[in-house]
Every structure is written in C-alpha cells, then in structure tokens.
Amino acid sequence: CCQFNSKTGELTEVQCVELLPEDFMGECIAAEIDCSPDGAYLFATTRGYYTSEGYDRIFTLKINPDDGTVNIVRDGPTWGVCPRMFKFTPDGKFLLIANQFSDELIVLQYDATSGRIGEICARENVPYAGAICIVDTQGENPV
C-alpha cells in the first residue's frame, strides 16, 4: 500500500501485504484492486490460471483510517476462473466480478457495514468477460 501526495505526485510505500499462503507454489498474479464505496475496505483479486494450484480469490482488507495500513479480514472465491475486474454498484449494495476464462459476470450481495461479500444474486454468461462498466439507468453516477 502506498500514500499518494497530491501536491508533488509522489508515492510512498506504507506497507506490503502478502495475499498468498506461504506454501503456495502455483502460478498466480494480481488482478484488480479497489476500495469499497465508503473507503473503509480495500479489495484485491488474484488469478491462478487453470492450474490445480489455482488461486482465484477476492480478499477483503480493513483500512486503518489513522495511518492507511490494512489488515486482511477474509478471503473468498470469485465464483469463476481468472477474475479480471470487479466493480461496486453506485449504491454500494452489490459487487460485480468479471471472470474472464469462465466467461461469466457474477453479481454478489455486499454488506458495507461489515465489508462482507454475500451470496450470488445473479450469474450471466458473458463471452470473454474482462471489463465492467456500470451505468446508472436513472442518469446518475456512471462507474
């Protein structure tokens, strides 16, 4: 995690957090990283690339508002293969995950109070799912 100085444009490393288990030996890379709409939690996904040791996960990290450090709270599945991108809905009630290699867009419940990702609300086949853009049909706040 880094602090950004908006006056100078500089980044300063604050903390490095290891998401993978110490004994993990498979191939895995980072996918997406973003904050919850209220800025209380940081979310990060990893991609394991179809290996038996694959590690397609989404991690929830609590942000310390005093110093910007984070602590892993929990991790869970992305409900597909090779997550590329995720987005919260503008109201913060749902989290959408695009899983590229399983060609799916997953919609999950999200509880902003606890930072907990809930049950699957919808699962849609989307060939080459890789990017998500959410447009508010009421004409407000595209994400």
Each language-model region and where it sits:
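Feature marking well-ordered beta-strand scaffolds used for ligand recognition
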Residues: 1-143
